[in-house]
């Protein structure tokens, strides 16, 4: 369950409140006044715990759980013990997350590391920087020449914002983040160690060896984007590197120069996207996907973890494997290899 040492509930909710807030249907109204004060997994649930079950394969864990209420679908209702309030919904996990944001708002809204929203006298801020009145700049942060930072944004200790960069409203720039040659939209979160706008990997062979190609573009990060810890996004050579609105990028991802990522994409940890590749809106990349340079990935594409993408992918397709190919082809080839191995083993 939620650790109350770090996360304290912000308010008191009853089961009836939860049903009203989410639109879930409460099947047993006698539980209307039951108090919910924390969120839990089925296994760790205790007094006052709210849980969710979205798939039947996890429903057996309801038996013996100490939770007082559960979000579930209609097909799971018959598995719920009589001791629990039943909140029926087609989206259990989404409704569970909504209540989590209400009960524990501090868990999704980064707070100042030193507890106060202020501009620290120990921050290093260039006199030409333009800061909105309610910006928080913590001790040890560095704000360069002509930087602009919008209202409600928090720049944490040891973050560095390079000259001429723009940071929008309600952004969170975590410790050890560096931002240079970049325009950042509103409600953007950059988590610890993220590096935005550094040189792209541009080199060319010359008479004296390997020579640097100047990187003269920018990084543009649109509204609502989240960039995970230690992720790196290189600025463009001439064209901009762009991360589209609402996209979420996990930890330890490398995005090379000139890459264009569409709106509301999900990119899991340890992916590497080579230069000048474009990824369409609403596409998803599993962990450790590698994408070659100058590839065009369409909208609504799903790519399995560990895949190596060497060719363009049309809209709406699901690919996997290395080199990546459509799921059906990939599964057939894997099945064929297994069959060959089985035949050889039998012949021995």
From Swiss-Prot:
<comment type="subunit">
    <text>Homotrimer.</text>
</comment>
<comment type="similarity">
    <text>Belongs to the transferase hexapeptide repeat family. LpxD subfamily.</text>
</comment>
<dbReference type="GO" id="GO:0016020">
    <property type="term" value="C:membrane"/>
</dbReference>
<keyword id="KW-0444">Lipid biosynthesis</keyword>
<dbReference type="InterPro" id="IPR020573">
    <property type="entry name" value="UDP_GlcNAc_AcTrfase_non-rep"/>
</dbReference>
<comment type="pathway">
    <text>Bacterial outer membrane biogenesis; LPS lipid A biosynthesis.</text>
</comment>
<keyword id="KW-0808">Transferase</keyword>
<comment type="function">
    <text>Catalyzes the N-acylation of UDP-3-O-acylglucosamine using 3-hydroxyacyl-ACP as the acyl donor. Is involved in the biosynthesis of lipid A, a phosphorylated glycolipid that anchors the lipopolysaccharide to the outer membrane of the cell.</text>
</comment>
<dbReference type="InterPro" id="IPR011004">
    <property type="entry name" value="Trimer_LpxA-like_sf"/>
</dbReference>
<dbReference type="InterPro" id="IPR007691">
    <property type="entry name" value="LpxD"/>
</dbReference>
<dbReference type="GO" id="GO:0009245">
    <property type="term" value="P:lipid A biosynthetic process"/>
</dbReference>
<dbReference type="Pfam" id="PF04613">
    <property type="entry name" value="LpxD"/>
</dbReference>
<dbReference type="InterPro" id="IPR001451">
    <property type="entry name" value="Hexapep"/>
</dbReference>
<dbReference type="GO" id="GO:0016410">
    <property type="term" value="F:N-acyltransferase activity"/>
</dbReference>
<keyword id="KW-0012">Acyltransferase</keyword>
<dbReference type="InterPro" id="IPR018357">
    <property type="entry name" value="Hexapep_transf_CS"/>
</dbReference>
<keyword id="KW-0677">Repeat</keyword>
<keyword id="KW-0441">Lipid A biosynthesis</keyword>
<feature type="active site" description="Proton acceptor">
    <location>
        <position position="257"/>
    </location>
</feature>
<protein>
    <recommendedName>
        <fullName>UDP-3-O-acylglucosamine N-acyltransferase</fullName>
        <ecNumber>2.3.1.191</ecNumber>
    </recommendedName>
</protein>
<keyword id="KW-0443">Lipid metabolism</keyword>
<dbReference type="Pfam" id="PF00132">
    <property type="entry name" value="Hexapep"/>
</dbReference>
């Amino acid at each position: 369950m939620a650790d109350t040492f770090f996360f304290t509930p912000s308010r008191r909710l009853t089961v009836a409140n939860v049903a009203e807030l989410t639109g879930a249907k409460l099947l047993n109204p006698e539980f209307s006044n039951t108090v919910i004060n924390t969120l839990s997994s089925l296994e760790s649930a205790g007094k006052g715990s709210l849980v969710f079950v979205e798939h039947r394969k996890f429903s057996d864990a309801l038996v013996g759980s100490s939770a007082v209420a559960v979000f579930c679908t209609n097909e799971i209702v018959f598995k719920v013990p009589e001791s629990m309030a039943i909140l029926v919904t087609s989206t259990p996990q989404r409704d569970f997350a909504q209540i989590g944001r209400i009960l524990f708002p501090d868990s999704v809204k980064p707070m100042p590391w030193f507890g106060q929203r202020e501009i620290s006298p120990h921050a290093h801020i260039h006199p030409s920087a333009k800061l909105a009145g309610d910006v928080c700049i913590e001790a040890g942060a560095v704000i360069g020449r002509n930087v602009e930072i919008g209202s409600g944004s928090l720049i944490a200790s040891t973050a560095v914002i390079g000259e001429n960069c723009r940071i929008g409203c309600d952004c969170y720039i975590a410790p050890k983040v560096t931002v240079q040659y970049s325009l950042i939209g509103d409600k953007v979160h950059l988590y610890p160690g993220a590096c935005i706008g550094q040189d792209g990997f541009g080199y060319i062979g010359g008479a004296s060896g390997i020579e640097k190609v100047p990187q003269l573009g920018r990084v543009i990060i649109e509204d609502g984007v989240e960039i995970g810890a230690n992720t790196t996004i290189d600025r463009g050579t001439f064209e901009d590197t762009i991360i589209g609105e609402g996209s979420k990028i996990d930890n330890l991802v490398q995005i090379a120069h000139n890459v264009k990522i569409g709106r509301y994409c999900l990119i899991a940890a340890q992916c590497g996207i080579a230069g000048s590749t474009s990824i369409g809106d609403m596409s998803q990349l599993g962990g450790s996907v590698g994408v070659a340079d100058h590839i065009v990935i369409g909208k609504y594409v799903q790519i399995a973890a560990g895949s190596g993408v060497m060719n363009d992918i049309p809209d709406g397709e699901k690919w996997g494997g290395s080199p990546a190919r459509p799921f059906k082809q990939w599964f057939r080839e894997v099945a064929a290899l297994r069959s060959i191995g089985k035949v050889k083993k039998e012949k021995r």
